[in-house]
Amino acid sequence: MESKAILRYARITPRKARRVVNLIRGKSAGDALLFLHFMPYRGAKFLEKLLKSAIANAEQKKAVNPESMKIVRTFVDQGPVMKRVEPRAMGRSNVIRKRTCHITLVLSEEE
């Protein structure tokens, strides 16, 4: 049985989120939670919250032991980009891109 959780419009760049996602792909849910809790990257907090949500979704659907769940698929897609203008010297300006991403996490029971 698969359980899915999606975090949309996360205010973190897709590149930085992928750095964390690539480290937890294929791990068991319990190991990944522990791994994410002590990871120094900002993206780890987003992923930890998302993983807890996916585990809760699995428990809601069917009585499942979280330790028997494994991360089957996880990926990061680019979301919309907010553009801001930063004034510079001599009447110029720079565009600051505040990137967002959509993170998808799919859990499945280990056989």
What spans do the regions from the language model cover?
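Structured, basic alpha/beta domains of bacterial-type, RNA-associated proteins
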Residues: 1-23, 27-111
